[in-house]
């Protein structure tokens, strides 16, 4: 789990330019996180979740509950955008469930 932008760059290889231009909560960041964690772990599968669980941090363009989930399987990466409802804990729990569902679908597509 990398909350800080510095950790995203240092451990997952997220580009500083990405964070400066589109922000930490973005499709590009989720993609780079998923690919970076797979690379760092020497794994065929990587998951990156970035979002605004709230409260706080919202902007007119990015509301609380906005989540991007990236899943990378064997170098193929897909990112989904979600606008989730609920309090901070509910948003986090729902994001994890959506991420696991995405992993399952990606594995089925890759291996069947």
Where are these predicted regions, by residue range?
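Short alpha-helical segments enriched in small residues
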Residues: 1-112
